């Protein structure tokens, strides 16, 4: 018994239809009335047994000659049997699929060709134009405040020069060079040095950049921030800001005003040589300009009160030989003429002692006024003398210079002692003269 499944039977029926000459076309009933005898049905030829080679040989024997051509021409069979076996491989006979493959291959070749040309164009552009080098500011040294000050300077330079090109004063040879700000900043040691910008006088010119100390750059930056903040507060109407501005203006006026050092005619010589001498030396060491004002208590009070107007006092008191009407009240007013002579001599001794102190301090001074009323001495620090040449330094050794200084000091001390003895003798003679009277 041979068992035939449903699928196998359907395949057999299709093959039977294709093998019959009467059924060249499906559902074609024109040839049914023909009297041609049908060929005997051979079931064994349709069965596939054994190996694949035997099956294929039987298939080829079953469908040979004109019957094979009939299978290919039957469009109903071709709908279900799209492949024919050639060995162990399946070959598609669909012409549409082959055309689609050819179209895809042409499209891919065109796309690849376009990509290649675009890449060649990019390579050509790269070789034609070299890429621009990105310039960046590298600020790694220094404190945060110093870095902020430097960033503020960079922004100021950018406002004037968009390309960051500046005129730079080279600190090594003090020559003016045109340089890029990035090179200057990247070579700068912000822990020690800073930068300072001078705005150009004309619009087209480049800004001038110099090196300075870091603390100077930070100070300039902080003052700018403070002034900017003050303006903002004043615009808002802050009372505290207005008060701070007034106090600052007063302090600036006091600094700009020349200092006045007051002396009374009744000062003793010991106080003059100790207290006042130390104060004069301290002011000279600071390099301050000041005025020595000698007079009575009334005039001293008016001098202290008019500190801001000492310029007018200087002009009024310079080159005054006669006593004014206002100064007549300050003249020595005593009944005994001998007391007047004694007071005048005492005042002369105070002025001589003061001159010796100023000469010892090596300061420049100018005396004006009248001894009967008041005297003003304008003092200024000594002018810096030029350093001696190297040849003179070699000739005068350090030991010889020290000896010379010591001798000069001794001479000055001896002169002072002699003056003091003379002053004391004069005072003693005056006092003895009074006692005898």
UniProtKB/Swiss-Prot annotation:
Protein species of origin: Debaryomyces hansenii (strain ATCC 36239 / CBS 767 / BCRC 21394 / JCM 1990 / NBRC 0083 / IGC 2968)
Biased composition (Basic and acidic residues): 117-129
Subcellular locations according to the entry: Mitochondrion
Source superkingdom: Eukaryota
Keyword Transit peptide among UniProt keywords: yes
Full protein name: Altered inheritance of mitochondria protein 23, mitochondrial
Biased composition (Basic residues): 107-116
InterPro entries with a match to the protein in the record: AIM23
Transit peptide location: 1-24
One of the Pfam families matching this protein, by short name: mIF3
Similarity annotation: Belongs to the AIM23 family.
Keywords noted in UniProt: Mitochondrion, Transit peptide
Top-level taxonomy: Eukaryota, Fungi, Dikarya, Ascomycota, Saccharomycotina
Region (Disordered): 104-132
GO cellular component: mitochondrion
Main location: mitochondrion
């Amino acid at each position: 018994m041979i068992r035939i499944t449903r699928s196998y039977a359907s395949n057999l029926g299709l093959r039977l239809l294709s093998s019959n000459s009467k059924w060249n076309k499906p559902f074609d009933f024109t040839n049914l009335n023909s009297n041609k005898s049908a060929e005997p049905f051979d079931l064994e030829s349709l069965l596939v047994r054994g190996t694949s080679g035997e099956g294929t040989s039987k298939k080829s024997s079953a469908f040979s000659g004109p019957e094979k051509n009939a299978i290919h021409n039957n469009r109903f069979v071709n709908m279900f049997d799209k492949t024919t076996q050639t060995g162990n491989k399946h070959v598609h006979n669909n012409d549409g699929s082959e055309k689609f493959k050819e179209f895809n291959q042409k499209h891919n070749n065109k796309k690849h060709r376009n990509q290649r040309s675009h890449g060649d164009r990019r390579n050509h552009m790269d070789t034609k134009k070299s890429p621009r080098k990105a310039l960046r500011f590298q600020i790694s040294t220094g404190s945060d405040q110093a870095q902020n000050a430097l960033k503020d300077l960079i922004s100021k330079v950018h406002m004037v020069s968009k390309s960051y090109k500046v005129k730079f004063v080279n600190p090594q040879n003090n020559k003016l060079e045109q340089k890029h700000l990035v090179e200057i900043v990247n070579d700068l040691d912000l822990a020690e040095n800073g930068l300072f910008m001078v705005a150009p006088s004309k619009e087209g010119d480049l800004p001038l950049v110099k090196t300075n100390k870091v603390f100077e750059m930070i100070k300039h930056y902080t003052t700018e921030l403070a002034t900017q903040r003050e303006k903002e507060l004043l615009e808002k109407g802050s009372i505290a800001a207005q008060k701070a501005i007034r106090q600052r203006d007063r302090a600036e006026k006091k600094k700009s005003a020349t200092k006045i050092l007051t002396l009374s005619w009744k000062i003793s010589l010991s106080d003059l040589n100790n207290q006042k001498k130390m104060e004069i030396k301290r002011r000279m060491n600071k390099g301050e300009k000041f005025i020595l004002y000698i007079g009575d208590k009334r005039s001293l009070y008016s001098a202290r009160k008019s500190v801001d107007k000492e310029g007018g006092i200087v002009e009024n008191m310079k080159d005054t030989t006669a006593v004014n009407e206002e100064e007549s009240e300050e003249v020595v007013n005593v009944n005994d003429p001998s007391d007047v002579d004694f007071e005048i001599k005492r005042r002369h001794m105070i002025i001589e002692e003061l001159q010796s102190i100023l000469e010892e301090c090596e300061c420049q001074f100018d005396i004006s006024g009248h001894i009967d009323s008041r005297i003003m001495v304008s003092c200024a620090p000594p002018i810096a003398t030029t350093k001696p040449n190297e040849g003179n330094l070699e000739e005068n050794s350090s030991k010889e210079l020290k000896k010379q200084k010591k001798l000069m000091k001794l001479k000055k001390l001896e002169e002072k002692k002699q003056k003091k003895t003379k002053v004391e003798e004069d005072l003693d003679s005056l006092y003895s003269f009074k006692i005898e009277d």
